[in-house]
Protein backbone atom coordinates (compact mmCIF):
# COMPACT_ATOMS: atom_id res chain seq x y z
CA UNK A 1 0.00 0.00 0.00
CA UNK A 2 1.48 3.35 -1.00
CA UNK A 3 1.76 6.36 1.25
CA UNK A 4 -0.94 8.19 -0.75
CA UNK A 5 -3.35 5.27 -0.38
CA UNK A 6 -2.74 5.19 3.36
CA UNK A 7 -3.31 8.95 3.62
CA UNK A 8 -6.58 8.59 1.70
CA UNK A 9 -7.77 5.79 4.01
CA UNK A 10 -6.85 7.81 7.10
CA UNK A 11 -8.70 10.86 5.73
CA UNK A 12 -11.85 8.81 5.00
CA UNK A 13 -11.75 7.15 8.41
CA UNK A 14 -11.15 10.46 10.19
CA UNK A 15 -14.17 11.96 8.46
CA UNK A 16 -16.32 8.92 9.29
CA UNK A 17 -15.21 8.82 12.93
CA UNK A 18 -15.72 12.59 13.40
CA UNK A 19 -19.27 12.45 12.06
CA UNK A 20 -20.34 9.43 14.11
CA UNK A 21 -21.74 9.23 17.62
CA UNK A 22 -19.92 5.99 18.39
CA UNK A 23 -16.91 4.00 17.20
CA UNK A 24 -16.89 0.35 18.28
CA UNK A 25 -13.93 -2.03 18.01
CA UNK A 26 -14.34 -5.81 17.89
CA UNK A 27 -12.15 -8.85 17.38
CA UNK A 28 -13.13 -10.86 14.34
CA UNK A 29 -10.38 -13.50 14.29
CA UNK A 30 -11.79 -16.81 13.10
CA UNK A 31 -14.87 -15.41 11.34
CA UNK A 32 -15.64 -16.66 7.87
CA UNK A 33 -16.03 -14.33 4.92
CA UNK A 34 -19.72 -15.22 4.79
CA UNK A 35 -20.16 -14.19 8.42
CA UNK A 36 -18.38 -10.87 7.78
CA UNK A 37 -20.65 -10.25 4.78
CA UNK A 38 -23.63 -10.96 7.03
CA UNK A 39 -22.33 -8.40 9.56
CA UNK A 40 -21.88 -5.80 6.82
CA UNK A 41 -25.39 -6.45 5.48
CA UNK A 42 -26.93 -6.13 8.96
CA UNK A 43 -24.99 -2.92 9.55
CA UNK A 44 -25.93 -1.46 6.16
CA UNK A 45 -29.64 -1.85 6.97
CA UNK A 46 -29.32 0.61 9.89
CA UNK A 47 -26.68 2.89 8.29
CA UNK A 48 -23.75 1.63 10.37
CA UNK A 49 -20.36 1.57 8.66
CA UNK A 50 -18.09 -1.48 9.02
CA UNK A 51 -14.44 -1.69 7.99
CA UNK A 52 -11.33 -3.72 8.73
CA UNK A 53 -8.33 -1.39 9.00
CA UNK A 54 -4.74 -1.69 10.12
CA UNK A 55 -4.37 -0.61 13.74
CA UNK A 56 -1.74 2.02 12.94
CA UNK A 57 -4.01 3.72 10.39
CA UNK A 58 -7.00 3.47 12.72
CA UNK A 59 -5.02 4.99 15.59
CA UNK A 60 -4.07 7.97 13.43
CA UNK A 61 -7.69 8.43 12.26
CA UNK A 62 -9.04 8.15 15.82
CA UNK A 63 -6.51 10.69 17.06
CA UNK A 64 -7.39 13.07 14.20
CA UNK A 65 -11.09 12.67 15.08
CA UNK A 66 -10.36 13.39 18.77
CA UNK A 67 -11.53 9.90 19.74
CA UNK A 68 -8.30 8.39 20.94
CA UNK A 69 -7.72 6.38 24.08
CA UNK A 70 -8.71 2.94 22.85
CA UNK A 71 -6.03 0.28 22.96
CA UNK A 72 -5.88 -1.47 19.61
CA UNK A 73 -4.25 -4.92 19.48
CA UNK A 74 -4.56 -7.98 17.26
CA UNK A 75 -7.24 -8.16 14.56
CA UNK A 76 -9.88 -5.45 14.73
CA UNK A 77 -12.99 -4.54 12.85
CA UNK A 78 -14.45 -1.07 13.31
CA UNK A 79 -18.15 -0.17 13.39
CA UNK A 80 -19.29 3.44 13.54
CA UNK A 81 -22.51 5.43 13.31
CA UNK A 82 -25.46 6.01 15.64
CA UNK A 83 -24.71 4.89 19.22
CA UNK A 84 -27.66 2.59 19.71
CA UNK A 85 -27.55 1.12 16.20
CA UNK A 86 -23.81 0.37 16.46
CA UNK A 87 -24.29 -1.34 19.84
CA UNK A 88 -27.32 -3.31 18.64
CA UNK A 89 -25.60 -4.58 15.49
CA UNK A 90 -22.45 -5.59 17.37
CA UNK A 91 -24.25 -7.22 20.33
CA UNK A 92 -26.63 -9.17 18.09
CA UNK A 93 -23.76 -10.37 15.91
CA UNK A 94 -21.70 -11.31 18.99
CA UNK A 95 -24.59 -13.50 20.22
CA UNK A 96 -24.70 -15.31 16.87
CA UNK A 97 -20.92 -15.74 16.40
CA UNK A 98 -18.52 -17.00 19.05
CA UNK A 99 -15.49 -15.67 17.16
CA UNK A 100 -16.76 -12.07 17.23
CA UNK A 101 -15.90 -10.29 20.48
CA UNK A 102 -16.65 -6.66 21.31
CA UNK A 103 -13.47 -5.09 22.70
CA UNK A 104 -14.20 -1.44 23.33
CA UNK A 105 -16.03 1.61 22.04
CA UNK A 106 -15.74 5.37 22.08
CA UNK A 107 -18.96 7.28 22.72
CA UNK A 108 -20.08 10.35 24.65
CA UNK A 109 -16.53 11.71 24.62
CA UNK A 110 -14.96 8.74 26.41
CA UNK A 111 -14.03 5.10 26.11
CA UNK A 112 -17.14 3.10 27.00
CA UNK A 113 -17.28 0.01 29.17
CA UNK A 114 -18.65 -3.29 27.89
CA UNK A 115 -21.58 -2.99 30.31
CA UNK A 116 -22.56 0.36 28.74
CA UNK A 117 -22.37 -1.15 25.26
CA UNK A 118 -24.61 -4.06 26.29
CA UNK A 119 -27.06 -1.69 28.02
CA UNK A 120 -27.33 0.50 24.92
CA UNK A 121 -27.88 -2.56 22.73
CA UNK A 122 -30.98 -3.45 24.75
CA UNK A 123 -32.65 -0.05 24.30
CA UNK A 124 -35.48 0.18 21.79
CA UNK A 125 -34.72 1.88 18.49
CA UNK A 126 -36.00 5.35 17.63
CA UNK A 127 -38.84 3.92 15.52
CA UNK A 128 -39.87 1.56 18.32
CA UNK A 129 -39.91 4.45 20.81
CA UNK A 130 -42.08 6.55 18.48
CA UNK A 131 -44.48 3.61 18.06
CA UNK A 132 -44.71 3.21 21.85
CA UNK A 133 -45.39 6.93 22.29
CA UNK A 134 -48.11 6.94 19.64
CA UNK A 135 -49.70 3.90 21.24
CA UNK A 136 -49.78 5.69 24.61
CA UNK A 137 -51.32 8.79 23.01
CA UNK A 138 -53.88 6.71 21.12
CA UNK A 139 -55.09 4.66 24.12
CA UNK A 140 -57.27 7.35 25.81
CA UNK A 141 -58.97 8.25 22.52
CA UNK A 142 -59.61 4.60 21.75
CA UNK A 143 -61.06 3.97 25.22
CA UNK A 144 -63.26 7.06 24.90
CA UNK A 145 -64.72 5.87 21.57
CA UNK A 146 -65.33 2.40 22.99
CA UNK A 147 -67.18 3.99 25.91
CA UNK A 148 -69.29 6.13 23.57
CA UNK A 149 -70.21 3.10 21.46
CA UNK A 150 -71.19 1.15 24.59
CA UNK A 151 -73.35 4.08 25.75
CA UNK A 152 -74.96 4.34 22.31
CA UNK A 153 -75.81 0.62 22.28
CA UNK A 154 -77.19 0.80 25.82
CA UNK A 155 -79.50 3.72 24.97
CA UNK A 156 -80.71 2.15 21.73
CA UNK A 157 -81.53 -1.13 23.44
From Swiss-Prot:
Keywords: Ribonucleoprotein, Ribosomal protein, RNA-binding, rRNA-binding. InterPro entries: Ribosomal_uL10 (IPR001790), Ribosomal_uL10-like_sf (IPR043141), Ribosomal_uL10_bac (IPR022973), Ribosomal_uL10_bac_type (IPR047865), Ribosomal_uL10_CS_bac (IPR002363). SUPFAM superfamilies: Ribosomal protein L10-like. It holds the Pfam family Ribosomal_L10. GO terms for molecular function: large ribosomal subunit rRNA binding; structural constituent of ribosome. GO terms for cellular component: large ribosomal subunit. Coiled coil: none annotated. GO terms for biological process: translation. Forms part of the ribosomal stalk, playing a central role in the interaction of the ribosome with GTP-bound translation factors. Belongs to the universal ribosomal protein uL10 family. Part of the ribosomal stalk of the 50S ribosomal subunit. The N-terminus interacts with L11 and the large rRNA to form the base of the stalk. The C-terminus forms an elongated spine to which L12 dimers bind in a sequential fashion forming a multimeric L10(L12)X complex. This is Large ribosomal subunit protein uL10. It comes from Campylobacter hominis (strain ATCC BAA-381 / DSM 21671 / CCUG 45161 / LMG 19568 / NCTC 13146 / CH001A). The lineage of its organism: Bacteria, Pseudomonadati, Campylobacterota, Epsilonproteobacteria, Campylobacterales. The gene is rplJ.
Amino acid sequence: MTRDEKAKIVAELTDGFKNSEAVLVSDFKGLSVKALENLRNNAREVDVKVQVVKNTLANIALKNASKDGMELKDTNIFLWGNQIDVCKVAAKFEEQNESFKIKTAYMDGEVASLSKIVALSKLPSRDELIAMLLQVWNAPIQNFTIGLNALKEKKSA
